[in-house]
């Protein structure tokens, strides 16, 4: 849907803020890619330098919204509010959620209380931090949640209410700068399962990958069939991050895996898809696994 049509569908927005729209790209969010992320981050940073712009709302498909939000959380260089919003139901549905979500997103972006909160996601009445937001359900309107930390706040009757802030580094505190980047390092995800074979991972060692995210079982544990491949990856200079396919809880350092011995990185609270985002940006700064572990601890 064109941005103009979205704004026309919710005329009440004009009572909250002076809103102008710009179409950056028109794709399904399942087709999101690094180039769009770089374009979006650069455009947002350019716009937020203007004194007449107080905040930005990004309409986005829900499939990869959590990844885009987290990428922007690490690359936007402003304390002005940046809010992502989408819809789980089509506009033709009996109870479409898009119009109210968009209204609440504009309310959130316009509120002075939203300043310096990091990039936000406004969905189904909740205000969520980009670092902790996860899509938890394939179809439900309450799909976006923060299972490890809870929502930052909520919107009710056109007003925002915040209950907490994130302690993770973001936006103006972030060391990552995409201003002069035209591409991101190649990082892939390996999903673990019982009886996984080495040939699922081996091709990544010779196809230009700079990093591998291992979506392990339990606390990021690694099957014996692919452990040698991942240690070989480290010998070749490919970074390896242990995350987990389990939806909640951290992947902790040196639990059942001796991370220091193998020079693996533990993803902490980040799920595999967000771990990929952080590792790509981390690799633009360094290949030192200890420094990258520090990034995962802080961001």
Briefly describe each language-model feature range.
Residues 1-2, 64, 70-83, 98-104, ...:
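A glycine- and small-aliphatic-rich helix-loop capping segment at beta-alpha/alpha-beta transitions
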Residues 1-47, 228:
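ATP/NTP phosphate-donor binding region
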Residues 1-10, 110, 122, 239:
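N-terminal phosphate-binding or glycine-rich loops at protein starts, especially the Walker A/P-loop
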Residues 2-13, 129-211, 219, 298-299:
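Accessory alpha-helical/coil subdomains and C-terminal extensions
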Residues 50-65, 207-219:
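Short acidic, glycine-rich surface-loop motifs adjacent to enzyme active sites
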Residues 58-80, 222-231:
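Short Gly/Thr/Asp-enriched flexible loops that form oxyanion-binding sites at enzyme active sites
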Residues 84-157:
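Internal gly/pro-rich beta-alpha loop/helix module
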Residues 219-299:
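C-terminal non-catalytic interaction/assembly regions of soluble proteins
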